[in-house]
Amino acid sequence: MTWLKHGCHVQDVSIPVPTTRNHVPGRHVKRANSLMLFTFTFFLPVVALSFFVFVPLVGAARISSSSSTNLVHPLENRLGSSSSNAPLTSLPGFDLRSLGASKIFAGTLTVNEGNGRALFYTFVTADVDDYTTAPVTMWLNGGPGCSSVGGGFMSEMGPFYPDANAPLGTKLVKNEYAWNRVSNMLYLEQPAGVGFSYTNTTSDLKVGDERSADDVRTFLLRFFEQQHPELAKNAFFIAGESYGGHYVPSIATAIVNGNAKYPHDLHINLQGIAVGNAWVVPQLDNYGAAYFWVTHAIISKPTFDKINETCNFFDVGPLLRDEGECDNAVDAAMNEMGNINIYEIYAPVCVNHQAAKRVSALANAAAPDSPFMRAVARKLNRQHTETTRAARRDAGQRNQPGYDPCIDDGVAAYLNRPDVQAALHANRTGLPYPWSDCSSIVEYSRKDLLTSRLPEYQNLVANGIRVLVYSGDVDAIVPVTGTRLWVAQMGLREVAEWQSWVEPETEQVGGYVVSYEKDFTFATVRNSGHMAPYVQPLRSLHMFETFLSNGKLTAN
């Protein structure tokens, strides 16, 4: 057993644990006011919309303590649901007939009439003979404050991706390994203020895990009762990534408690949750990130030692700068790391107008717009795409469009088209700001951000909820090293030891897996980062399908 200060124990793992001076009960660390948690979408603009790096905030959801914004929905007396019980009949730049039996629904459902809170969603039926026999899975990207429509639906496991070889935002290409092959898929933009979801009440933009979870439970009740009653009794799963490590168990807990407390409400048939590269226990996830950097040779051992000695892992992270020596250690890490793709360390970066000006993966992403650099970037990224397409083909993704490190540019351009918004029943009342992948107006609770959600996972397991925790093994932000630490703290008995698992179509090792009592599984997805379903779609689909069927990932 290894002792972590502040009373945390880490058992049965060989990863060293923090020894920082800041792990002293009651120590207060003064922080620079200008530094906030930064979600990665604006750091290296590629596919995921939900990750953490601890650098100056640029355009993502803020950690609440500042004054409220006035950017709320301005049309209070036009509140109402804009969803339709009819599937989409057309979608610009894409032939819906290519989806086979699958249909897409989209719209907005009100979750609080008094304040005017309404959440936007897309829903993709399973590509099976009878979708009413398939489970329903809700996917949530993290942030906090990032879009599951821009993330999951448009750039990870959804039915299509932006076409990197077409003019920006004009065409989509089919995802052959979309998760709706095996499940009905619901993608929800939450909390209000994210994406096309809105509120008429400024104070709603200050939000945390509890209200987010309550709003999502209300949304689900109305979704199943009003929009898809034919699916109300189906097995229901929740999946997510990054800050989804908070969202998912909080929502699952609200559902379990609601089912027990309100027997006359619709019973949501929650069966399990899955979280990828999940932010769960801040001090362990923070330490795990720094440890990953040094063990993957992107920073030096002396720099790691200095971060470990001088930076506070119990705050928002080793890279939210402290005064003095911690600040110097952060500078050293930035210089050593260079401008790599920090959430997929062996993948190319997006060489756009901002990234071209940066020299470090941890540097401020703010930069003036440069059409020339963007044009250069499009050419360079096509070259990167050809290289990574070959790598994905070798891994079994034969018909996939290839990894595009600038996919979020295409997503934003596409979702801001008026004809696309009309097709999706989105933005019908005219939001006073464009759609963006991560909200700049939501002010998320710092207290919740720094709260461990481990007790919720333990309680869900005790209530018979199946849990899959998975890690893309080359993510350097919420990496496997931190996840292994908090999984060990679950206190569960191991029932099947660590072993490889094989993706059967390609007969290649898809990752590694260990199983615990009470249907708790921890798996890795080999050669993928923070957005495993995009980078390794076939392996991720096999893992997801195995989880839904309550099967086992095996080497056979």
Regions found by a protein language model. Name each.
Residues 3, 7, 30-556:
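Terminal and linker regions of secretory-pathway proteins
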Residues 7-13, 24, 29:
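Short hydrophobic alpha-helical segments enriched in small aliphatic residues
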